[in-house]
């Protein structure tokens, strides 16, 4: 007896109930994927709404023309919102006016362990929103520093970084070294210090003459007093003079014009100052605070 090969027509057809189970399983998978996408979309939508509400309240408190940037970290958002506990919120804003002096202050803040019931966020009750740990920075531009006494006596005030060694000792006729505040070791980010060097330059009137003066000073963060202090160390004449050496009598008369102090209580993010960094044209103050109200961040 000769056997013949089995053809496709000879194979048993799948049962109708098996086909139905396969289609039903695919429908469940598709439905599950759609449900997950809807939940993720709802989560991101709710987070965006909360970020918008916080941004609007911060805009009102900080007297801004535009909404600041607010990012609520962590996923899923809804579990954080329902519990009123947020692990990490980032807030950044620029162009913040402070009192009648500063007009263009920039703020960056990292808020951790935030207690913010959803009802308080939607109702704008910022006093009920508390921050467990706050790490922030406030950047003040040279144009704003020039509005603070006694720096307001200096015309065309400019700010540049310098090294502590150069501020204290000069260079005995050599050019100023590259500031350590701009870069530390290769591949590493800038590091903040409680004190660092700065070069302040501008024009001052003395004995009826307009003098270009370079002041080499230290900026020091005083955590106990909550202040940032400019401590002038020495002066040099600018390039419009025949010599850079400033006579002792002139130094004594002009040095107080560079002796300034900034209270962090007068700035947004009323923090304890922990570090200061000088960049070309600005000074950045870093600080920390604990157990503060969101409503108090603009004080």
Question: Where is each model-derived feature located?
Answer:
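Terminal targeting segments of Actinobacterial cell-envelope proteins
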Residues: 1-29
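Hydrophobic membrane-insertion alpha-helices, especially the h-region
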Residues: 29-43
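N-terminal beta-strand/beta-hairpin edge segment
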Residues: 65-144, 152-205
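Short, cysteine-centered beta-strand-loop-beta hairpins and adjacent loop/turn segments enriched
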Residues: 96-102, 204-212, 239-240, 292-297
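Acidic, Ser/Thr/Gly/Pro-rich low-complexity segments that form flexible
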Residues: 212-214, 228
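Hydrophobic/aromatic beta-strand elements that line small-molecule binding cavities or substrate pockets
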Residues: 215-220
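Extracytoplasmic/luminal low-complexity segments enriched in Pro/Gly and acidic/polar residues
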Residues: 221-299
């Amino acid at each position: 007896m000769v056997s013949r090969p089995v053809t496709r027509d000879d194979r048993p057809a799948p049962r109708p109930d098996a086909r139905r189970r396969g289609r039903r399983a695919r429908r469940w998978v598709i439905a599950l994927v759609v449900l997950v996408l809807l939940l993720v979309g709802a989560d991101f939508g709710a987070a965006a709404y909360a970020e918008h509400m916080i941004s609007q309240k911060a805009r009102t408190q900080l007297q801004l023309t535009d909404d600041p940037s607010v990012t609520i970290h962590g996923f899923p958002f809804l579990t954080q919102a329902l519990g009123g506990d947020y692990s990490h919120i980032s807030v950044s804003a620029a162009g913040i006016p402070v009192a009648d002096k500063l007009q263009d202050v920039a703020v960056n803040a990292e808020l951790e362990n935030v207690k913010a019931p959803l009802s308080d966020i939607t109702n704008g009750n910022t006093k009920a929103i508390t921050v467990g740990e706050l790490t922030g920075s406030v950047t003040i531009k040279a144009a704003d520093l020039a509005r603070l006494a006694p720096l307001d006596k200096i015309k065309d005030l400019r700010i540049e970084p310098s090294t502590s060694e150069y501020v204290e000792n000069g260079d005995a006729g050599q050019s100023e070294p590259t500031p350590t505040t701009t870069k530390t070791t290769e591949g590493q980010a800038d590091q903040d210090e409680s004190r660092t060097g700065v070069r302040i330059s501008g024009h001052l009137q003395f004995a009826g003459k307009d003098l270009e003066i370079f002041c080499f000073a230290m900026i020091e963060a005083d955590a106990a007093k909550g202040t940032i202090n400019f401590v002038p160390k020495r002066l040099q004449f600018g390039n419009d003079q025949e010599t850079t050496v400033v006579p002792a009598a002139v130094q004594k008369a002009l040095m107080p014009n560079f002796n300034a102090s900034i209270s962090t209580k007068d700035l947004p993010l009323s923090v304890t100052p922990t570090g200061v960094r000088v960049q070309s044209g600005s000074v950045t103050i870093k600080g920390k605070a604990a157990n503060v109200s969101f409503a108090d961040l603009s004080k």
